Amino acid sequence: GGTPSNLSVKQLRTLTDKMKDLFPWDETEEVAFECEPGTLSEKKLEALRDIGVTRLSLGIENFDDHILEVNGRAHRSMEAFRALRFANTLGFDQVNIDLIAGMMDETEDNWKRCVDTAIEQGPDCVTIYQMEIPYNTTIFKEMKAAGRVTAPVAIWPTKRAWVDWAFNRFEEAGYSVSSAYTVVKNPETTKFVYRDSLWEGADLLSAGVASFGHLGGVHYQNQADVGPYMTEVDSGGLPIFRAYETDHEERFVREFVLQLKLGLVHPSYFQEKYGEDVMTRFPEQLQ
């Protein structure tokens, strides 16, 4: 994550070689890699394949150049199509594309064209998000400066309706819904090991500036600025900014909420792992 495709081929090889020295990839089930389409060339994608990336995720978001521009995206549609073409010819195990519903200036017609274009491209997996404006984004700062209190994006009921339409459209095209965000072309062969493991409480070792991690029930975030981050790293310390240790109840509720995103829960899983009967703990939520 964190759009590592901004790194050069040389930097990527150096980084992953050092990672493999610490954590050999010989028996790795999945190596997922997030890309900004405008940063990709055929040479870089070849390097990613040779490094061992199995799941390539392209942050396309939309296929309309105007939408991409007004939302501050660095790439344009031709770069997205080019990246998809290269990725499909290089034989990655799985290619995912991200779409965002309700971006600034987006209309229902645009959204429907975007979904249909994604179907025409035929990726293995499509992940659909709904546009949000976090407080630390450029768009939010511009809103605050202008005295606006409402984000210039589609309202939540509209975004939910568009996502619902998209899921139905993908299912008509032969895709299967695998989570609250994701559709896959072939559920028998298309797996997302990282997501499924994380939603079952697996550790997540985050290394980047401002990144969030989860180790042994402790949630943490690294330093959000490069200066303090490098000061800690150069001195041999851990660049952790804040952390929170969860208890048994919090870990149980966390996993329950995360697995609701799959659209179903397995009571036996929680009974065996936490000794909790979700059917009696959350009867109203599971109705």
PLM region descriptions:
Residues G275-Q287:
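Short amphipathic alpha-helical interaction segments
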